[in-house]
Amino acid sequence: MNRKVAIVTGTNSNLGLNIVFRLIETEDTNVRLTIVVTSRTLPRVQEVINQIKDFYNKSGRVEDLEIDFDYLLVDFTNMVSVLNAYYDINKKYRAINYLFVNAAQGIFDGIDWIGAVKEVFTNPLEAVTNPTYKIQLVGVKSKDDMGLIFQANVFGPYYFISKILPQLTRGKAYIVWISSIMSDPKYLSLNDIELLKTNASYEGSKRLVDLLHLATYKDLKKLGINQYVVQPGIFTSHSFSEYLNFFTYFGMLCLFYLARLLGSPWHNIDGYKAANAPVYVTRLANPNFEKQDVKYGSATSRDGMPYIKTQEIDPTGMSDVFAYIQKKKLEWDEKLKDQIVETRTPI
């Protein structure tokens, strides 16, 4: 039986779980698939594994697909934690076949309700596609003295990839970076690559993801690794729902469906539809023919049918961003020498 290993960061999110569900549905027959669940804390690991087991038992794949589980405790805002995650992977796995970089941390501080109401009434479609009323904190640094969102969504995952490159090469892996519909170039200043001066650090981090992908996918291809960047469209997210009550959440859903009815392809609403593109590029796309310098998006038609829609990526600033991140990587290679500790606990 052929063995494959899949690491999904942010497995406990709505999108992360649905990526795993779709991977289970589409994986080849007669495969033993090890799903490496990632989390910052151990209690959440078992909860997520139980959810995946429940889906698998109902999926109709029990007879032709064997799955097992492992876990990885990693906090991408802590570079020692990132190094320990590499240490754990290096001890246990010779090859990795899938890596889904589903890092989507934001430092939200609520909603500008006056601005939200104004946007909804003046341009409802734009209000639920490219909202500007989400309040994000500015200037937040990690304990490693980096921009928190820069480290969480970009540098931490990139550093992890650089460390496990031998395993990814042996597995002829697919790397999938999860970007966003809101990764417009306007959200990133090359004078603020760590996103410390902006009030749109989340969106800026996704722009960095786009550029980092463009800067690296060709070299990875030479190693037999296929890297893609995707965006899941717009869907219900647990992380932002905490700022909504029952009525505002229901209102948001109504506006999402209205936007889809008015022709928006990006209002997937459901996390399962949002996970379409991440799994499409690993299971259905042909890397010999399909372009890797575009972004693959999860889209949905007016009548709710999911499909894939590609978007061009503006490469402006790619070289500057890559040079900055490479320099930062060398700095942390030096800082992290001999700083590995054992963190695993049996589950």
Swiss-Prot record:
The keyword Transferase does not apply. Its main location: endoplasmic reticulum. One of its GO terms (biological process) is ergosterol biosynthetic process. The active site is at residues 179, 202, 206. GO terms for molecular function: 3-beta-hydroxysteroid 3-dehydrogenase (NADP+) activity. Heterotetramer of ERG25, ERG26, ERG27 and ERG28. ERG28 acts as a scaffold to tether ERG27 and other 4,4-demethylation-related enzymes, forming a demethylation enzyme complex, in the endoplasmic reticulum. Interacts with ERG25 and ERG28. Also interacts with ERG7, but only in lipid particles. This is 3-keto-steroid reductase ERG27. It comes from Saccharomyces cerevisiae (strain ATCC 204508 / S288c). The lineage of its organism: Eukaryota, Fungi, Dikarya, Ascomycota, Saccharomycotina.
